């Protein structure tokens, strides 16, 4: 099995700097969850984290970079879970189970930070696809698809499975159309069902004829 590495891992830093970073990112995440990213200021984050506002600016520079740090923090946890975590999301489960677990977990991850991910994916038309996280997701899905259906175009199908989880479409379905998260996941299951081979079997009707 090809080993995957977590994308965008943090560089080594002093213990006190790392502690301050965790406090700031955690405080920012909580404030954003309550008020939305546009309503959160650096001053508020500093107060909630118990650090000086200068520390926040020195560490992150501006609010946009702080927002991306909140995304990255959650992203590293997600990547670690599907690369190193327990099955079925992590290694050790059959490929069809890992495929389903990954897409469900990615739906949960998108649900948790949909507005922030829309911001991150805005910009150039290919912004989403140039992100290192997308490349890792694509590689992971292509690997699993190659085990589920050897010989298929895994590169194309990996893109096809990731397309419904683009943050802007996901947010439109959840907020505008009012789709429950369970419905989104059921739709993903239907896509997977079209890819997972079904063993040949003989079905008998009540008359005794083989179908």
What are these model-derived regions, one by one?
Residues 47, 61-62, 72:
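Residue-level detection of the helix-turn-helix DNA-binding "recognition helix"
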Residues 50-60:
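Short hydrophobic/aromatic patch on the recognition helix
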């Amino acid at each position: 099995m090809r080993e995957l590495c977590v994308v965008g891992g943090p560089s080594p830093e002093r213990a006190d700097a790392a502690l301050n970073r965790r406090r700031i990112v955690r405080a920012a995440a909580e404030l954003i969850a309550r008020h939305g990213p546009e309503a959160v200021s650096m001053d508020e984050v500093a107060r909630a984290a118990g650090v000086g506002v200068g520390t926040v600016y020195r560490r992150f520079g501006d609010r946009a970079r702080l927002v991306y740090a909140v995304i990255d923090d959650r992203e590293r946890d997600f990547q670690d879970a599907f690369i190193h975590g327990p099955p079925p999301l992590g290694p050790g489960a059959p490929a069809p189970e890992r495929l389903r677990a990954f897409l469900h977990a990615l739906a949960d991850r998108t649900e948790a930070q949909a507005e922030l991910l829309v911001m991150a994916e805005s910009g150039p038309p290919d912004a989403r696809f140039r992100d290192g996280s997308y490349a890792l997701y694509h590689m992971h899905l292509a690997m699993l698809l190659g085990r589920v259906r050897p010989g298929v175009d895994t590169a194309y199908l990996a893109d096809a499975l990731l397309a419904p989880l683009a943050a802007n479409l996901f947010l439109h379905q959840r907020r505008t159309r009012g789709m429950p998260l369970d419905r989104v996941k059921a739709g993903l299951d239907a896509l997977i069902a079209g890819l997972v081979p079904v063993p040949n079997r003989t079905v008998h009707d009540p008359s005794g004829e083989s179908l």
